Amino acid sequence: MTINLHRPDIAELKPRITVFGVGGGGGNAVNNMINAGLQGVDFVVANTDAQALAMSKAERVIQLGAAVTEGLGAGALPEVGQAAADECIDEIIDHLADSHMVFITAGMGGGTGTGAAPVVARAAREKGILTVGVVTKPFQFEGARRMKTAEAGIEELQKSVDTLIVIPNQNLFRIANEKTTFADAFAMADQVLYSGVASITDLMIKEGLINLDFADVRSVMHEMGRAMMGTGEASGEGRALAAAEAAIANPLLDETSMCGARGLLISITGGRDMTLFEVDEAANRIREEVDADANVIFGAIDDESLEGVIRVSVVATGIDRLASDVVQPSHSKFQKSVSSVRKNDSGINQTASHPQSSQLRSESMVETIESLEVEVSQSQPVEEMFSPKSQIFAKPTDTASTSSRSAATYPFGHGQSDIYGKISNASRIQVNSIPQQSTAAAVSMEATAHVLSEMTNIVEQSEEKQAQIQPYIAPARMPELKDFSPFTHGQGIHSSGLEQGPRSLWQRLKQSLTYREEIEPEARLEPAVKPLQNEESHIYNKNVQKVSSQDSSVYAPHRSTKLQSRALQDQRAFVNEEDQLEIPAFLRRQAN
């Protein structure tokens, strides 16, 4: 009796990933991925063009619509491509068997890719395969009709896939230069597909420090709508942050934003020198871009071949909003109001009921504000200087000339002082700070003009009252001897002579003879002011006379009382001096 021993059959438990290229663009993407050496995936190419299939490097190819197109292309007709795919649906399902995840890549805008890709996606979804679509949009120079066809195909494909990634070919100009060849540009676009597939393959196949499997990938990408993929590599100082920035800022992807992502898959790969702080820095930088409630799955892989380099791969899913909707929210009411204001030439928002009156009122307000601005800019505030309370120390000529000059320079209604100068400066600031071209100034210009007009009227009225009541105050100076009356001069000289001591007979005789000559008529207490030629200074002359009369009561000596006291002092001094003098006896006897 023979006993046969053999090993039991063990089913392969590793997930199977298939890259399905549809049409000419999909076939070229598969060829570029094969040339790049991507491992761990199966490649399938399906096309209606027999000549393009002959150039494919994939092991499995599908001739679509042999009876419909007879080996020719679809002629940029999506209906033909769809019919060709429906003809070969059984063969497509056979190639999708035993697959856990399928990437469908195609170029939108043509016939085969636009029409056949949704058919392949529906077949994969019906078999429960996680389906991810990676498609391109045509260039701008290919025309608007091809772009409309591509958008319609993308809309149809999105209904049949779990996650969709769109790469506009026009974005190739962001990274290309004048020396970039046409083939190299398409290879750059295919690099997005390659990096996304490679990152997911590494997560599911390679063993890492933080291991992820296909179940984690499915939870992030199942029925998530629009998505984005990105990979960044960096070395040197700050390499972790630089790699994360490059991963989330892929210039080739469609105008999408990670702010509304509901699922996030982060894969960080590095050598033995990758530190914990670098992993934390890169992961936190990416996590800041998504919603706080997003499903974040993180994986880390140790690869000895990446010594000194950190690679960060990101897959963000559930992005259903455009970047323009996130950055610039649209408010129809606000935009309508702004447009209506910009159409108004005068800068005031016009109402529908009275458009003509509002326009006239706004134009008059603008003219009033401009005139006020010119007048305020021409006026200069006068600095206030110290002056004594009395007007007796002021120079008469300076008073007259300054008064006339002040009246000529600052007419009534526009005179400036220290107090009102501040108000004028404030009004000037308000006038200059009104941007007449901005929408905010257009709304508030009416109220500002009303306030400025009221302020101007108040200033003019107060300045007129101030000019009528308050006289001109001359600058302070030290009084001189010539400013006093001649009687004061004589009194000072005579008093200085009394202080010298007893006088001789000749001095007394000389004093008695010259005493009456020294006494002059009553001195003028008021300064000799020249008559003002300007009639506007009449009020000022009255004010000066009133103040001078008040000062005379303080400084002017009373003539009657002063002369009497002076005569008594002279008689007493004469008697005392006569007794002190040595008069000869014969003169004394003759006098008696």
Swiss-Prot record:
Annotated GO biological process: division septum assembly; FtsZ-dependent cytokinesis; protein polymerization
Cell compartment(s), UniProt: Cytoplasm
SUPFAM superfamilies in the record: Tubulin C-terminal domain-like, Tubulin nucleotide-binding domain-like
Superkingdom of this protein's organism: Bacteria
GO CC terms: cell division site; cytoplasm
UniProt keyword terms in alphabetical order: Cell cycle, Cell division, Cytoplasm, GTP-binding, Nucleotide-binding, Septation
Entry-linked NCBIfam families: ftsZ, FtsZ_alphas_C
Protein name as catalogued: Cell division protein FtsZ
Gene: ftsZ
